[in-house]
């Protein structure tokens, strides 16, 4: 079993460097010592510089992408080092004026190295960006509110299509109250939201309907 975190690393030294950093160059230098596990790092200093780096050791594989086990008795499937530090995904002072990250996909097809296919769905990132762009200047309270925000853009994308289907179904009259309630929903998943309960139940049922009978029981 080969894993970057099983190799000698210097994360504690990196963290000490973060705490002593006076600017992005200092922080960037300390990042060189943070090797595993790979992390999304965001940076800001009092001069106004903001930056982001997807940092850590990312293997360059001779064959394959690491999704499935490979023969361990052949060097053909080994690693050819790591993605060079200076080629890790990095953003410094973007035009948007902010940086947001939520484990979303950070590189496109043009990026020359394989990182992973297991990105989070984009909805959390999109909601963060939506809130950051909602005001020209954000207060500390605004930032606290962003941390506690529960609006579900996943529901906002899919639910309107479901509602159209419900209305066209033979059972539309029977479930008219539920349909009307879902139509009125603002997609905020508060603790007492009945619409949120219905939506998430539907998503679980869709998963069951699509995949349960099509996949072996031991891998579902």
Write out the residue ranges for each language-model feature.
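Long, compositionally biased non-active-site segments enriched in small/hydrophobic residues and glycine
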Residues: 45-220
């Amino acid at each position: 079993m080969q894993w970057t975190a099983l190799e000698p690393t210097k994360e504690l030294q990196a963290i000490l460097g973060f705490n002593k950093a006076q600017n992005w160059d200092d922080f960037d230098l300390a990042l060189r010592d943070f090797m595993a596990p790979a992390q999304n790092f965001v940076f800001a200093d009092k001069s106004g510089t903001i930056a982001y780096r997807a940092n850590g050791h990312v293997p360059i594989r001779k064959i394959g992408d690491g999704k499935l086990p490979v023969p361990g008795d052949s060097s053909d499937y080994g690693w050819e080092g790591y993605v060079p530090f200076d080629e890790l995904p990095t953003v410094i002072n973007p035009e948007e004026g902010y940086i947001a990250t939520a484990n979303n996909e950070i590189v496109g097809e043009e990026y020359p190295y394989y990182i992973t296919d297991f990105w989070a769905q984009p909805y959390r990132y999109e909601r963060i960006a939506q809130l950051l762009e909602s005001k020209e200047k954000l207060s500390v309270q605004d930032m606290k509110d962003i941390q506690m925000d529960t609006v579900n853009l996943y529901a906002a994308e899919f639910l309107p299509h479901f509602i159209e289907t419900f209305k066209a179904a033979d059972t539309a009259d029977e479930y008219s109250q539920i349909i009307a309630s879902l139509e009125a929903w603002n997609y905020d998943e508060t603790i007492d939201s009945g619409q949120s309960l219905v939506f998430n139940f539907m998503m679980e049922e869709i998963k069951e309907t699509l995949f349960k009978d099509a996949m072996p029981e031991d891998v579902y």
